[in-house]
Every structure is written in structure tokens, then in C-alpha cells.
Amino acid sequence: MPNMSSGDDKNFDLEERTAVFGEKVIDFAKAVPRNEVTKPLISQIVRSGTSVGANYGEADDAISSKDFRNKLATCKKEARETKHWCRMIVRAAPEMRELAKPIWQDAKELHLIFSAILRKTSPPK
């Protein structure tokens, strides 16, 4: 689905970015050679990579600031987990290294974005 953002809505931009990230993860997973080692890794990276956008959508519709932070924390965890599965896939299929780099980089950037949002929205201690 194309980006339907007017360009002014930053939340929608992150929603679109997380959706595109999930699409990239799916495309990457489809390119990984299938064998007994990579099959479970592929399933894991698809789960974590597509979960980022789904959980961000949930955060965007949160009913409270606590709910928002909890959903964003899940986004952060799933982005970090996607980096892990990316690394494991490259270990199992070294020929995937170049295709994995942008996925790993996007996951790292999303992890940092969610970390920053969580820091800014956490109540003072």
C-alpha cells in the first residue's frame, strides 16, 4: 500500500516506516535458502520484523500513556530481536550477508528511535 501521508504527520511516517520495514523483512526472508537450519530462523525473523509495525500501530492507538510506552517497549524489543535473527541467518547462510545489512541497519535505527521516544515519554523519577 502506498504511503498516504501528507508529509506533515510524523506518527504516520513512523507507521509507514515500520510497515515498509516489515515488507523488507518478508522479501529478505523469501530470498534466504531453505534448509533445516534456516527454516526456523526465517520464521523467527518474519515474526519479529513484522511485529514491529503491528505493535507500533497498537501504540499509536493506545488508550493511555502507560499503554503507549508498553507497546513501544515491545516495538523496541522486536527490532532488537530482528537484528539477532538477521545475524543468525548470516551465520547459517553467509551468502546472505549483503542482503542482511540493510535489514540489520533499519532494525538498529528503529531500536534507537523507539529508545529515544521511550526516554522522552517516561515519567520523571
Describe each PLM feature range:
Residues 1-125:
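Short, C-terminally biased terminal segments at protein or domain edges
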